[in-house]
Swiss-Prot record:
PANTHER family: LEYDIG CELL TUMOR 10 KDA PROTEIN HOMOLOG. Belongs to the UPF0390 family. This is UPF0390 protein AFUA_1G03640. The lineage of its organism: Eukaryota, Fungi, Dikarya, Ascomycota, Pezizomycotina. InterPro entries: UPF0390. Residues 71-90 have a biased composition (Basic and acidic residues). Residues 1-37, 61-90 are annotated as: Disordered. Pfam families: DUF2462.
């Protein structure tokens, strides 16, 4: 049997997210041996060259797409033509 009145429930507070920022990844320990340091420098140089080359090719392809019909330049030209034809109406 119940001994006393039931406890009133308190309104729950809004839950705060435990992680406010993205979780940090594992830290990389720098190599100590001279051969490994040299190897790391070479790989860094090569990967930088590869990324630069891929970015350059992507930029060329994007530029080539603008030359085709329907690019940004064509849309701007069409807007200007529309303004010239319409003019001001009094």
């Amino acid at each position: 049997m119940a001994q006393g009145p039931l406890k009133k429930t308190k309104p729950s507070t809004a839950k705060r997210p435990t992680a406010l920022a993205p979780k940090r990844g594992p830290r990389q320990i720098a190599p100590k041996k001279a051969t490994l340091i040299k190897q790391q420098k070479i790989t860094k140089k090569l990967t930088a060259g590869l990324t630069a080359k891929t970015e350059r090719t992507l930029a060329q392809r994007a530029g080539h797409l603008e030359l085709l019909a329907g690019g940004k330049k064509d849309k701007k030209a069409e807007k200007e033509k529309g303004k010239e034809k319409g003019g001001k109406k009094n």
